[in-house]
């Protein structure tokens, strides 16, 4: 590919998630001079605040059940009551950094120029990355999206699915708002890690669209395990009293907790 108009790059990508990285690498292998910018961590949602850290959390939480099951096979195993949150976070972060490094290496190997910083468009061919300005013939915006908090009183006291992976300490009691598979999975994860868990869903039963028998069985099992379930209600507001959050439900109930994921 031949550059025209003396641009710095033939092709520039804003956003180094899985799509942006893939697009930039393919363009570079076809002969284009390519640049890419990312203001957070390279790899996008899945690597940093999605599939990977969530599965690491699920893996860690699953150990508690193994300790209990081992007793039935003759093992004298005492299940620990407390998870060392600092050790867990260090392990999680190390794995994510390893994957960040792999993505960085793939870009370098393909000959893509990587910029770490916030990119914005100045005109159809000019990109500003913090204090650096570059030009490109073609520009791809691959920035993805960010979670939006509910417009309720006290929403600033709630966390999004991005925030939940950066907790400084393990929640003692977490309230999860929602009934999709992500919310239900987080309920099981934090329960397995030893946190008290409440889940609030606006419908009759979570996991809408899944097999009804599975949904009912899962509800019964979660109740049996001690997960506090609330249906036909939604989060109406949040008040903070020192280290305690008071979650007001549309049903009129109030849940006291220290962490709210909505």
Residue ranges and their predicted role:
Residues 235-262:
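C-terminal structured domain segments across diverse proteins
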Residues 2-9, 25-32, 37-170, 203-207, ...:
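Glycine-rich flavin
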Residues 31, 194-196, 226:
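Glycine-centered short loops/turns at secondary-structure junctions
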Residues 22, 149-150, 184-185, 190, ...:
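Glycine/Thr-rich phosphate-binding loops of Rossmann-like dinucleotide-binding domains
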Residues 9-36, 176, 182-192:
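N-terminal Rossmann-like FAD-binding beta1-loop-alpha1 element of flavoenzymes
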Residues 17, 118-120, 180, 233-237:
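Conserved acidic residues
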Residues 11-14, 119, 134-144, 176-177, ...:
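Short hydrophobic core segments
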Residues 168-210:
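Rossmann-like NAD(P)H-binding beta-loop-alpha module
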